[in-house]
């Protein structure tokens, strides 16, 4: 499996201010539980605006990036991101290349059997089409389309499930083309190489609001999104931070600023041994 990054620099220190803060207080997670001393190393695939993306200056932005920075700050750690494609994230976590997957990984029981996971965000699947395509309005309207999707994620799994549903109903089904990341999938849609892209509601809504693509179908296969860890002690510490952020209102404020729904759960850790 390729660990090719989508930027020249694999590691990005988010801000010197965050680093200075981490150095001015006592870390709440010992170095023995971290990949890099004093640092919360997080993997991200920044191809999902407004959740995570790279702005015109090359800086990481988005709700999940902000959340990761705040988690690190409250743990008195320096935030550091590794930009990597999703298909490499779980193997990289298991190999100890980063502490935390912070890319909006969908929570499933199968994943929670091999990782420590904290569900924190509600999401669902959308299908984006060209703005000129006004015919697709529901799942049945997707039948026969060539659609693009990121390789290896929940979105690909559900795209194949949708294909199976359509075929079981006696329809043609989908022609599915996988891409290393969502940026490439949306580029293919823009170029007319695919007729639709399967992504998450928040991303499809963003592109629709910009006038780039039309969000034709949304709300499919709703499921919680999580952060994920190999280390149980670190997961417990982050769970405590999220609970504190919910109590003091900062988590709700962050979600509201992006128009996103918070989960109804208690931000507890779910994983092996739980």
Task: Label the model's feature ranges.
Residues 24, 65-74, 133-136, 140-154, ...:
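Extended ligand-binding regions for polar small-molecule ligands
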Residues 69, 73, 78-141:
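Acidic, polar ligand-binding/catalytic clefts
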């Amino acid at each position: 499996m390729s660990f090719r990054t989508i930027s020249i620099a694999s590691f990005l220190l988010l801000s010197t201010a965050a680093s200075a803060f981490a150095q001015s207080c006592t870390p709440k997670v010992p170095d023995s539980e971290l990949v890099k001393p004093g640092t919360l190393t997080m993997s991200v695939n920044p191809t999902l605006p407004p959740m995570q993306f790279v702005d015109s200056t090359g800086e990481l932005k988005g709700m999940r990036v902000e959340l990761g920075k705040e988690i690190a700050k409250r743990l008195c750690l320096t935030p550091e991101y590794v930009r990597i494609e999703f298909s490499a994230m779980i193997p990289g976590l298991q190999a100890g290349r980063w502490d935390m997957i912070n890319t909006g990984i969908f929570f499933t029981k199968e994943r929670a059997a091999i990782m420590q996971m904290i569900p924190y965000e509600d999401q669902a699947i959308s299908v984006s089409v060209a703005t000129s395509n006004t015919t697709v309005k529901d799942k049945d309207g997707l039948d026969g389309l060539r659609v693009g999707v990121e390789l290896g994620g929940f979105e690909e799994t559900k795209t194949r499930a949708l294909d199976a549903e359509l075929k079981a109903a006696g329809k043609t089904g989908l022609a599915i083309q996988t891409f290393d990341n969502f940026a490439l999938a949306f580029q293919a849609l823009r170029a007319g190489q695919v007729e639709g892209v399967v992504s998450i509601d928040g991303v499809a809504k963003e592109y629709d609001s910009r006038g780039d693509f039309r969000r034709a179908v949304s709300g499919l296969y709703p499921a919680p999104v999580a952060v994920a860890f190999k280390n149980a002690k670190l997961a417990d510490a982050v769970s405590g931070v999220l609970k504190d952020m919910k109590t003091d209102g900062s988590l709700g404020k962050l979600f509201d600023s992006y128009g996103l729904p918070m989960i109804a759960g208690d931000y507890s850790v779910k994983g092996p041994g739980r």
